[in-house]
Amino acid sequence: MLEIKVVGSGCPNCQKLEALCCEVVDENNLDAKIEKITDFNQYGELGIMMTPGLIVNGKVLSQGKIPTKSTLEHWIIDSN
């Protein structure tokens, strides 16, 4: 099972990244758990300095921007 963490305060960009992750997981029938991390104190512990942040299976893949859907799909499928 993939473990996907979307890190951020819940701002519009964080919500968009979470929605994109859900789309990619659903469209590719992936077994994944998507977790939102909104506790600012955890950001640094997770290696996130800018939000939104994306962590897949413990690896920071993006921070401070929203990847394109195709890039996100590539990252998630490659991490599976």
What residue spans do the PLM features occupy?
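Local sequence-structure signature of Cys/Sec-based thiol-disulfide redox active-site neighborhoods
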Residues: M1-L20
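Conserved helix-turn-beta segment immediately C-terminal to the redox Cys motif
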Residues: L20-I34
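Amphipathic, hydrophobic secondary-structure cores in small proteins
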Residues: I34-G47
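Structural micro-motif
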Residues: G47-I55
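Non-catalytic, surface beta->alpha helical segment in thiol-disulfide oxidoreductase systems
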Residues: K59-N80
